[in-house]
C-alpha cells in the first residue's frame, strides 16, 4: 500500500509500505494492504511503519487518516521521522517548556507549554529507540 504523511509544512513521507501502526484517539490500530476504507482521528504518539520487513518510527501529533483504495493518507499537525530529530534542540525545547510550566502563567500559556513538552518527550522517545 502507499503511505502519504503530510503536515502543513511539507510532505514527510510518500512510499510503499507493508504495515502501519497508528495511534488514534480510540487506541492503536494496525493497517495492512487492502484494509477496509477508514477515516479516523490521530492521537499524539509514535507511528510505526514497516517496510522491507523492518520497522521505523515517526513522531506524530494530531490530524486525521484516510484509508481508501490501498492508499493511506495521513494529514497530521506535526510529524517527523526519527532520523530527522535533532536531539539537542528537542532537549532544549523540553527544558524551556518545563520552565514555562513552573512559572506563573495564564491557562493558555500553560496549555501551550504543556503541548510543547508532550511533543518534545515524544520526539526524544522516538529518536532514542
Task: Pin down the residues of each PLM region.
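Absolute protein N-terminus
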Residues: 1-2, 129
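Compact, glycine-rich, soluble single-domain proteins
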Residues: 2-96
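Acidic/glycine-rich phosphate/pyrophosphate-binding loops and surrounding catalytic core
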Residues: 79-129
Amino acid at each position: 500500500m502507499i503511505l502519504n504523511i503530510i503536515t502543513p509544512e511539507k510532505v514527510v513521507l510518500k512510499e510503499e509500505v507493508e504495515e502501519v501502526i497508528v495511534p488514534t484517539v480510540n487506541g492503536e490500530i494496525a493497517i495492512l494492504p487492502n484494509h477496509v476504507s477508514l477515516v479516523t482521528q490521530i492521537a499524539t504518539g509514535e507511528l510505526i511503519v514497516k517496510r522491507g520487513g523492518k520497522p521505523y518510527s515517526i513522531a506524530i501529533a494530531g490530524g486525521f487518516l484516510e484509508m481508501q483504495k490501498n492508499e493511506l493518507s495521513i494529514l497530521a499537525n506535526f510529524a517527523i521521522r526519527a532520523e530527522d530529530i535533532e536531539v539537542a534542540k528537542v532537549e532544549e525545547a523540553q527544558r524551556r517548556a518545563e520552565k514555562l510550566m513552573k512559572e506563573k502563567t495564564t491557562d493558555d500559556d500553560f496549555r501551550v507549554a504543556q503541548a510543547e513538552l508532550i511533543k518534545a518527550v515524544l520526539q526524544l522517545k522516538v529518536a532514542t529507540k
